[in-house]
Amino acid sequence: MGEYVKVGNLQVAKLFYEFMNDEVLPGSEVNKEKFWKDFETLIADLTPKNKALLARRDELQAKINEWHKEHRGNFDMEKYKAFLTDIGYLEPEVDDFEITTEGVDEEIAVQAGPQLVVPLTNARYALNAANARWGSLYDALYGTDAISEEDGAERGDSYNPVRGAKVIAYAREFLDQAVPLKEYSHKDAVQYAVVDGKLVVSVEGGSTTTLKEEEKFIGFQGNPENPTAILLKNNGLHIEIQIDRNHPVGKTDKAGVKDIYLEAAVTTIMDGEDSVAAVDAEDKVLVYRNLLGLVKGDLTSTFTKGGKTITRALNPDRVYRTADGKEITLPGRSLMFVRNVGHLMTNNTILDANGEEVYEGIMDAVVTSLIMKHSLLGNTRYLNSRKGSFYIVKPKMHGSEEVAFANELFDRVEDMLGLKRNTIKIGVMDEERRTTLNLKNCIYQVRDRIIFINTGFLDRTGDEIHTSMEAGPMIRKNDMKTSVWLQAYEKSNVTIGLAAGFQGRAQIGKGMWAMPDMMAEMLKQKGGQLKAGANTAWVPSPTAATLHALHYHQVNVAEVQNELRKERKDYRDEILQIPVAVNPQWTPEEIQEELDNNCQGILGYVVRWIDQGIGCSKVPDINNIGLMEDRATLRISSQHIANWLHHGICTKEQVLETLKRMAKVVDEQNAGDPNYRPMAPDYDNSVAFQAACDLIFKGYEQPNGYTEPILHRRRLEAKAKYAAVQQ
């Protein structure tokens, strides 16, 4: 642990104290002395409440464990529901209401589109994500498996015109679907021009045509008769046809089209939670400093690619002229949210009056809000919100009393920083069972500031397993995806969100496509999330955002939501169906296959987290398919093995043998990484391997099955160990 400064009754890490005083507070219109005094008061007031909420989690879990032990073999759903109601796990539902959130940006309230999630510890990734508001469709198609490599269309080191032709044909087909012409096809176009306020398209043979729906033409760049860009709009998202007859692609195109740019990631979650490994003041300052750079617009990242030095910075806005000569400006960057941590963890960046670590969620709320305040005061190169709001995603809350606590925290932060009430908007992750079952009540507690609810398979299943740990052995992990409770959870989230008036006001989000290399498959499947009522869904990369944007042109989300709003089904009984395997008949091979898969996934993620502080990366699975993993993958996998161990489906010796065997596989998969520390054969001396063992063998007693306590402890151990070796 580094040096501390005594500030009132707080002890504040010197590194963090200087960062706040020198970089964050100046220009914030918040007095330095008052800030630290108010911060101390806030910590003193809210710490006991935070502790009480965590104690309540443990109390409920203990009662549920006992109930399952007493009723093993004679489970009765009605008795189970009555029990959950008696202990306050199932809350009495509030009356119908609609949210009243005001000052919400169009990217949330009006536009349906992809959402990126990116670790704040990596400046380059964060900048790429912020800039993924617009993406090249040609690049996204050419560089991925979205276009097959059959018939001579291979991706190679140099440009392949056969592949290029397939890309162009695909893109023209997309234009014909999204912005069709009255007659002919975009494939026939030889020129795009603006004549008498309309987009006029000349085709081969001398004929001209216009758009079938002329209102989809928004503007252009360049001269009307020879524009360099045509701006169109469909289902609320923009499309930019770029024209340059001197460009290598443009000069081979009849109409001179060099590319088609799509409005893609309309929102991005800058993440300080599950995709980062931030365990001390040094890490937290990196998270906060990168956020400050993004908000102020001065963050840059310099790196070498192909022998060239490249500097990334935020993209400027895009300016066009409308048909009647007016200028319009569109944002060049994604609207940024920031994800804080949940209520569980503490961090040694600040020690309170009792010398105890402060709750990280309280610290995050104060610091990220103060950073975002700069965008309201105009201390920034670019505007993030045009409505004077900022957006904090709050994860891993259990039930409405925890959401009410987040609301109280945000109220207090607004008062402390001189912000109008409900300036801080909240996104509530629906990823814990008690929140799912009481979602309407959770939303009610933040009805004046909520802008987002979201489902996620991994964390939610982790909590499902842990909550019902004593109910019996769980079904296999892959079978969870088609289980009754999970389908009901996904539908219930949409139904409750729409009934609470989210349409036109807030986002209803769906989970991550975790396979960034499998874009053809994503194009086939991910549109289903929009048909299920989502108006945003998570993607793992800017390229994936561009391709996922195609789904929003194919599916009119507003129409889907209009239909779904008519449904008012209560899914609670289905959500309560515990995914326990009834008389499992798994063969030894099937059990081993499940263990191999889970152990390999745990080790592949943990080894980078513990040894290198990487909280999100493309981790090869057991079949060498790259999966974009964050901490949620650990929770489901470690809890699944812990459950099977607890019920005797496998033995500790078998799991340990599997871990050791899989460690060798993971070592091999990472052989090309010069910073990698192998786990085999000295398993006892590998902090990462020991962390993986802890996650499984101590999984039963982890609070709600969370992985953070073990990860943080082991990462701090690894940092100290490797620092000592370097000295």
From Swiss-Prot:
Coiled coil: none
Organism superkingdom: Bacteria
GO molecular function term, any single one: magnesium ion binding
Keyword list, A-Z: Cytoplasm, Glyoxylate bypass, Magnesium, Metal-binding, Oxidation, Transferase, Tricarboxylic acid cycle
One Gene Ontology cellular component: cytosol
Alphabetical list of SUPFAM superfamilies matching this protein: Malate synthase G
Localisation: Cytoplasm
Residues annotated for acetyl-CoA binding in this entry: V117, R124, Y125, S275, R312, P540
Assembly with partners or alone: Monomer.
UniProt protein name: Malate synthase G
Organism, scientific name: Geobacillus sp. (strain WCH70)
